Amino acid sequence: MRAGLLYRALASLGDVRVIVVPVHAVCYEASGLCPADRLTVVDLNGAADVRADLVARVADPLERARVAALHPRPSLSEAATIEVAQSVAGLVGGAPLVLVMREYLAPYLDAVLDRHARPMCILDVDDVESTARRRSGEPAEAERYESLERHYLRRFDHILACSPTDASDLRGRYGIDAMVAPNAVNIPAPRRVSPRWDVLFVANLSYAPNVAAAHWLCHEILPLMPDATVALVGLNPSAEVYSLRAENVFVSGTVPDVEPYYATSRVVAVPLQAGGGTSIKVLEAFAHRRPVVSTTTGVRGLPITAGKHILIADEPQSFADACVRLLDDCSAGKRLSEAGYSLVQEQFAIERVTASLSGALSRLTSNRGE
């Protein structure tokens, strides 16, 4: 979704080429983002982690640990060899503007960042990864991302953050003034259909914090609502998510469109306990006029008032109680969903955010040319 927002904003300024660096085990389908002839996937086959190989050759264990600590690299940046970075630079060519999505892709732009006469380079920090990884209980990976952030953030001409909260985090830790480019969602036409599911959780179901959230929902919360049904819907469910299937738990697998599931569910749950950025899940539920129960983590960075737009609960019993309240009291759910819908219309509708971001990018490029 955020990729689509950024693509739309860039496309309003001129021709856009999309370069996909497939760092995940699964290369998600990107052809729907742009015309096929404007999309290139970088070949990472054989791109060994040279840094890790060199560190492994240091014989003394203490010296090896010291070298590894001096040159940490997040796992998703391990394929950023000199050859791969040069390949990316060749694909960039003479483009006047390069926008990189996600911190871990910054090392793949090394050969471009090192140019004397280089394009304007913008890094989109959808998550402050060091913060997100620390919340996820990954201290070693968090330290690697902190090293990456210290080394790379200032090498970019501009930084985008998805919320004022993340912008403040970057300013406080690195002295960087990031421009806020909020997440945005499409607002669908309302549909009248009979409910099928009591509680819906929509997410990328291969992402570790979402897998943990699904597990918490099904094993800790659902037993406290024995008559309720749950639908887990989203991209590429892990084996652990599939193992949650039961008589009252449905796992969809990857679907082309989540709209039918919103239309046939009564309450949306956002049971996140870790992760960063802002939750598109919450905004998407608001756009579909569905009442939402979320943890505090799930609404981080969003201008939301508990009790007005959403119900917030951080313990299994209180989360279950909030869901049951909305299932039993349709008028309470309607009040929340209408307030959430109004908020999305005013601040997070895709057309509004795209226009604002397009204007900001246009001003940045114009100022550079002066």
Give residue spans per PLM region:
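N-terminal subdomain of nucleotide-sugar transferases
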Residues: 1-43, 93
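Short hydrophobic beta-strand element within catalytic cores of glycosyltransferases
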Residues: 281-287, 291-295, 311
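A short, well-ordered alpha-helix in the C-terminal region of glycosyltransferases
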Residues: 332-347, 353-358
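Conserved acidic donor-binding segment of nucleotide-sugar-dependent glycosyltransferases
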Residues: 310-317, 325-331
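Conserved catalytic-core segment of nucleotide-activated headgroup transferases in glycan assembly
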Residues: 2, 8-9, 172, 180-264
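Acidic donor-binding loop of glycosyltransferase active sites
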Residues: 157, 263-277, 288-291
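Membrane-proximal helix-turn-helix segments that form the acceptor-binding/catalytic region
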Residues: 5-6, 82-92, 123, 129-130, ...
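Donor nucleotide-sugar binding/catalytic pocket of nucleotide-sugar-dependent glycosyltransferases
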Residues: 120-123, 130, 150-190
